[in-house]
Amino acid sequence: MKTLLLTLVVVTIVCLDLGYTMTCCNQQSSQPKTTKTCAESSCYKKTWRDHRGTITERGCGCPSVKPGIQLECCKTNECNN
């Protein structure tokens, strides 16, 4: 009976994917710090300049960017602040 219960617990954990999640900053430019819990294993910070000045975008994952956009990807909680 104990073996069956242990097996059910392990199967539940594997099926629900109760693994590690990241906490990434997601505020834009100079806005107050906000965070988001992400399923991805990394966070990013994109920076570029336009007529408004320097723009910063933060979020989950590590996206592809166009030339002229600086991208920093990292793998620890809130590392993209």
Swiss-Prot record:
It comes from the Eukaryota. One of its GO terms (molecular function) is ion channel regulator activity. GO terms for cellular component: extracellular region. Disulfide bonds join C24-C43, C38-C60, C62-C73, C74-C79. CDD domains: TFP_snake_toxin. This is Short neurotoxin 1. Binds to muscle nicotinic acetylcholine receptor (nAChR) and inhibit acetylcholine from binding to the receptor, thereby impairing neuromuscular transmission. The lineage of its organism: Eukaryota, Metazoa, Chordata, Craniata, Vertebrata. It comes from Hoplocephalus stephensii (Stephens's banded snake). Residues 1-21 form the signal peptide. SUPFAM superfamilies: Snake toxin-like.
